[in-house]
Amino acid sequence: VSATPIFAIDYKSAEFEVIGPRPIRFRMGLNTSVAIWLDELDAHVAFIIVPSGMPATMTNARTPGDGLRWLQDMLRKTRLQWLPVKAHVSDDEGECMGGVCVFDVPFALVDEWLMWLDQDAAVQATGSGYVMLRSHPAIRSTRDVD
């Protein structure tokens, strides 16, 4: 896993903006708006993945944007429901990173994406309103929810 622990701290403090017919912005922690939003979308769980690593299958990837394009291309070939995301990672500079929000995807598939994208974690939003990190399988702790 190549992302640094500092990136994980930034990830936890970021604000996530899901773009779509029912847009929403939220941070990590308990958020009843997330529970209502997921209920309106008839979804139980959402995972936000903001690629910062390079996909294992791309030997000539040059930027994190290459990882995002790879993930979007893969998602377009599935029947999974997903929306684009902006992760606002810095309040001071307005820095944003692109990502995706995928609904009701099996946990094992999220773990595969984390491994293929060389990501430390994904953001997991649940129907109870909890927004937390789901760690890469190699660094997973007992605090993660399956």
For the regions a language model picked out, list residue spans one by one.
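Short, compact, well-ordered microdomains
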Residues: C96-M97, D104-Y130
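N-terminal, charge-rich interaction modules
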Residues: V1-D73
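A general structural signal for short secondary-structure junctions and capping/turn motifs
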Residues: L38-D39, D92, E112-M115
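Short, low-order "capping/linker" segments at domain edges
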Residues: G99, R134-D146
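Short secondary-structure capping/turn micro-motifs that flank functional sites
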Residues: D91, Y130-V131
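Structural alpha-beta junctions
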Residues: R69-L83, D118-D120
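Short alpha-helix boundary/capping motifs
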Residues: G65, F103-D104
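Short, intrinsically disordered low-complexity segments
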Residues: K77-F103
